[in-house]
Structure formats: C-alpha cells, structure tokens
C-alpha cells in the first residue's frame, strides 16, 4: 500500500498501520478506550489528523470506481480486505479512530458508498456482509451517543453526525433503535440547515471553503432523503440547492 496523507510524502505501509502518524512516526497504542486517548500532545510533533484522515477511508471510493470501470476483482478485493483489516485493528470504541464522532460518520458513509459500487463482485460474500453490517451498527450507535453539538451554533462536526445518522438510519430503518436515531437526525438536520444556512443559500460564516464543506454535509443527506421518497420541506431544499 502506497499513499500520501496530509503532506506525509509517499508512504509504503503493508499492512496498513491505522494508528500511525506517518509524518512523525508516532503511533497511538492499540486497545485503549477512546476517551482515554490524548489527541494533542504539545510535547511532541505528532498529528492525530493523519491516522484519522486515513481511517475516514475516502480512498475506498476510488477503488470502488476502479471496480465499476474495469470489473476487476482486485479492486473489490482490496475494498473488502481493507474494511476487514480496519475492523480487526480498531475494535469498537477501543482505538484512536473512535475518538471523534465526525470521523466515525464520514467513515461509515464512505464504506456504504464503496460497498454499493462493488456489491455485484463475487468477493462480497455473506460472511463479509455480516461483519460489515455489525460494524456499521456499531458506528451508528457510537455517533448517536457521542454527538458534537455546539452552542449557540453548531458546525461541521455536528452536521457530519447528523448526516451519518440519516445515511445509517435509512440503511437500518427496520431496527427500532436505529429508527429512533434516524428520527432525531432528521429533525435536527432540518433545524441546523435553517439555523446555519441563510435564505440565499450562503452559510452564515460566509467562508468560501467552509461553505463548500457544509454544502456537502447538508446536501448529500437531503438528496438521499428525496431519493428515499421523503417530502423534504421546500425551504430546506432551496437552502441547499
């Protein structure tokens, strides 16, 4: 595996070390309860964003796209193997990669998109589906019980939490507890959009780069809700359009 994360330079890691800051060489210990980790230590030059960014699994979407284009199972196999390896190396709530609900939500949605692209591959078997389903249930439980709501305004972290609850809530809509998470996420998503997005569609902080991020975090769940047959309020639609 060769990749670059947040200016680390080209790194080779096989198997992938999900706990390492490749820029400084610092590694967060395995098997520690997520609330006991020190994310920022001013005594060294470690950057927790490096392992966390890698564990968001954005790169799995590229592998999924490669499979769709080529139908080559080497790409679907890599998606499956990386997810299985991540689950093994990051038991629920016991790694640095469970320390922030925003990252948990982003990872879950990326997994869902990547898996959707490779579902017709013979590599995706029942054993794997059961394993990833269990992990995604852990993800939605974690998000709901670690919400990052701010006051008087929330921001990208809370929006990510709510987006994750919408995506995972629709996936597991037949599970009563998850339906509760979804209902909460839906009402809060609408409230946050009305609070944070001006009627003109501009985010209240009026920062171009931040506006771009918030558009993604609000628009994707709204469009998913529409696709799932929900009647999205007109003012919500126009704020994210």
Question: Where are the regions a protein language model picked out?
Answer:
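Aromatic-lined, polymer-binding surfaces characteristic
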Residues: 30-31, 37-41, 47-241
């Amino acid at each position: 595996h060769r990749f670059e994360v947040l200016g680390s330079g080209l790194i080779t890691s096989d198997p992938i070390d999900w706990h390492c800051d490749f820029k400084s060489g610092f590694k967060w210990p395995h098997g520690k309860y997520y609330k006991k980790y020190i994310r920022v230590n001013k005594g060294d030059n470690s950057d927790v964003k490096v392992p966390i960014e890698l564990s968001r699994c954005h790169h799995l979407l590229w592998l999924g796209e490669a499979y769709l284009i080529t139908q080559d199972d080497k790409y679907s196999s890599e998606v499956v193997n990386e997810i299985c390896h991540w689950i093994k190396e990051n038991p629920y709530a016991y790694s640095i990669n469970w320390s922030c609900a925003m990252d948990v939500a982003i990872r879950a949605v990326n997994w869902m998109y990547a898996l959707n692209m490779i579902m017709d591959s013979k590599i995706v078997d029942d054993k794997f589906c059961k394993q990833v389903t269990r992990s995604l249930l852990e993800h939605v439980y974690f998000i709901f019980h670690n919400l990052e709501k701010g006051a008087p305004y929330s921001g990208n972290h809370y929006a990510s939490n709510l987006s994750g609850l919408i995506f995972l809530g629709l996936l597991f809509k037949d599970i009563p507890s998850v339906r509760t998470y979804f209902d909460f996420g839906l009402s809060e998503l609408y409230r946050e959009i009305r609070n944070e997005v001006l009627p003109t569609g501009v985010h209240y902080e009026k920062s171009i780069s931040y506006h771009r991020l918030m558009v993604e975090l609000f628009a994707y769940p709204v469009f998913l809700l529409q696709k799932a047959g929900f009647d999205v309020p007109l003012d919500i639609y126009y704020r994210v359009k």
